[in-house]
C-alpha cells in the first residue's frame, strides 16, 4: 500500500472533532477537549460556545462542571451537505457513544 505523505490538512474540522469528543465524553472540560484534539483551551472554549449558540450542543451545570448533550437532528452547515444530519456524521466518527449522548 502506498504511503500517504505527511501534510497539515485534515478531513475533519476542529468543530467536528470537538463535537465528536463531546459526544464521547459528555462531562469533559474545555481543557480536556483541547488536549485530546491538539488545540488551545481558548480555541476549544470558542468552538464549544459556537456549537452551543448554534444549537448543536446544550450545556447543563452539574456541580462545578458542565454536562453536554448533542442535538443530532440539525443539518450539517455546508450548503452541499444540508441534507445530512449531524447525527449521521457522529454515527460514523463516534459510533460507540453517538446514540447515548444525544438529545
Q: What does each model-identified segment do?
A:
Residues 32-35, 52-53:
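Alpha-helical residues within the helix-turn-helix
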Residues 46, 50:
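Alpha-helical DNA-recognition elements
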Residues 9, 22-25:
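Short helix-capping/hinge SLiMs at alpha-helix to coil transitions
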Residues 1, 75-103:
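Amphipathic alpha-helical dimerization/coiled-coil segments
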Residues 4-15, 29, 61-84:
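Short, cationic-aromatic polyanion-contact patches
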Residues 16-21:
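Pre-recognition alpha-helix immediately N-terminal to the DNA-recognition helix
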Residues 42:
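Key DNA-contact positions within bacterial/archaeal DNA-binding proteins
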Residues 52-62:
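A short, conserved structural fragment
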Amino acid at each position: 500500500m502506498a504511503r500517504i505523505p505527511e501534510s497539515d490538512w485534515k478531513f475533519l474540522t476542529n468543530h467536528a472533532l470537538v463535537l465528536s469528543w463531546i459526544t464521547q465524553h459528555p462531562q469533559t472540560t474545555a481543557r480536556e477537549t483541547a488536549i485530546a484534539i491538539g488545540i488551545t483551551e481558548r480555541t476549544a472554549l470558542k468552538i464549544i460556545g459556537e456549537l452551543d449558540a448554534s444549537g448543536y450542543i446544550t450545556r447543563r451545570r452539574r456541580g462545578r462542571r458542565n454536562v453536554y448533550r448533542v442535538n443530532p437532528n440539525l443539518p450539517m452547515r455546508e450548503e452541499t451537505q444540508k441534507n445530512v444530519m449531524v447525527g449521521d456524521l457522529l454515527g460514523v466518527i463516534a459510533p460507540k457513544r453517538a446514540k447515548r449522548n444525544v438529545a
